[in-house]
């Protein structure tokens, strides 16, 4: 629906001025608050509209990608605005859309997820009959593979799998790094 897309674009533009969801929802939007506009539009289109999350991404250069069909959108922050940053940021944003990483790097993976992955690896190794004495070392290797598959900068770059995403970014400028990313997917019926 064209009017919904326009509303979403207007909200996105307005959201740039706020640091929290609460402040954004309380903001003026043509004489009413954003929260009131959401309720009004829910009545118009017959579907509940809500802002589920609100995060600010900071960086010297922010690139974006919206996947065909407008169901997935990503933002990527780079450490510098160098020539070619727009193309690199878009390509890394496409990577984040396609590969759905859970974190930027190892440091961004929560401790519970790490513990769970180690335990899964150990359980599988036990089922294979591996001795307890070597489980920790093999599980560490499996955890490294988990990080490679599930953290953005460590993933194989989808356009050249000989490079990690971090290496691809550094191919533009040796000091350039990805400092953050956000991935949002449309959830219907929740």
Question: Which stretches of residues belong to each language-model region?
Answer:
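N-terminal assembly/interaction segments in proteins that build large macromolecular machines
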Residues: 1-190
């Amino acid at each position: 629906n064209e009017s919904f897309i326009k509303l979403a674009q207007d909200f996105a533009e307005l959201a740039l001025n706020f640091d929290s969801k609460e402040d954004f929802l309380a903001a003026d939007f043509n004489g009413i608050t954003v929260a009131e506009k959401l309720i009004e539009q829910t009545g118009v289109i017959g579907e509940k509209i809500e802002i589920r999350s609100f995060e600010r991404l900071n960086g010297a250069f922010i690139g974006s990608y919206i996947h065909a069909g407008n169901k997935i959108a990503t933002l990527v922050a780079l450490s510098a605005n160098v020539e070619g940053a727009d193309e690199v940021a878009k390509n890394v944003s496409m990577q984040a859309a396609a590969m759905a990483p859970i974190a930027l790097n190892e440091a961004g993976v929560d401790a519970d997820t790490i513990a769970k992955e180690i335990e899964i690896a150990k359980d599988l190794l036990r089922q294979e009959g591996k001795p307890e004495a070597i489980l920790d070392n093999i599980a560490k290797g499996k955890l490294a593979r988990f990080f490679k598959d599930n953290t953005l900068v460590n993933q194989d770059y989808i356009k050249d799998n000989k490079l990690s995403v971090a290496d691809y970014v550094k191919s533009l400028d040796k000091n350039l790094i990805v400092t953050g990313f956000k991935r949002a997917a449309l959830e219907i019926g929740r």
